[in-house]
Amino acid sequence: MGGISIWQLLIIAVIVVLLFGTKKLGSIGSDLGASIKGFKKAMSDDEPKQDKTSQDADFTAKTIADKQADTNQEQAKTEDAKRHDKEQV
């Protein structure tokens, strides 16, 4: 009903061949095939490299006390850095 029938596809194919010619369509087809082949090769080349270098993230559960200890250590480091900067001036 609303779809394209085989006859409509054949008519479109004949019109395309008449417009472009068989030589032009052949070269376009071979260029398209070569580009698809190159794309697939590039995709398969990237996958092994990605698998070798990728590592899962190391997530550790932290409690509130651990987080507070981390922030205290960071604050102490920044205070030491500030004192060191003041001493240099």
UniProtKB/Swiss-Prot annotation:
The chain crosses the membrane at residues 1-21. It is a single-pass membrane protein. Disruption phenotype: Disruption of tatA affects the correct localization of multiple enzymes whose precursors bear twin arginine transfer peptides. Export is completely blocked when both tatA and tatE are inactivated. GO terms for cellular component: cytosol; plasma membrane; TAT protein transport complex. It is found in: Cell inner membrane. Pfam families: TatA_B_E (PF02416). Residues 65-89 are annotated as: Disordered. TatA forms a transmembrane channel with a lid structure on the cytoplasmic side. The number of TatA protomers can vary so that the channel can adopt different diameters to accommodate substrates of various sizes. This enables TatA to pack tightly around substrate and prevents ion leakage during transport. Absence of TatA from the TatBC complex leads to the instability of the complex and the specific breakdown of TatB. The Tat system comprises two distinct complexes: a TatABC complex, containing multiple copies of TatA, TatB and TatC subunits, and a separate TatA complex, containing only TatA subunits. Substrates initially bind to the TatABC complex, which probably triggers association of the separate TatA complex to form the active translocon. A complex containing only TatA and TatB has also been identified. It could be either an assembly intermediate or a disassembly intermediate generated during translocation activity. Belongs to the TatA/E family. Part of the twin-arginine translocation (Tat) system that transports large folded proteins containing a characteristic twin-arginine motif in their signal peptide across membranes. TatA could form the protein-conducting channel of the Tat system. This is Sec-independent protein translocase protein TatA. It comes from Escherichia coli (strain K12). The lineage of its organism: Bacteria, Pseudomonadati, Pseudomonadota, Gammaproteobacteria, Enterobacterales.
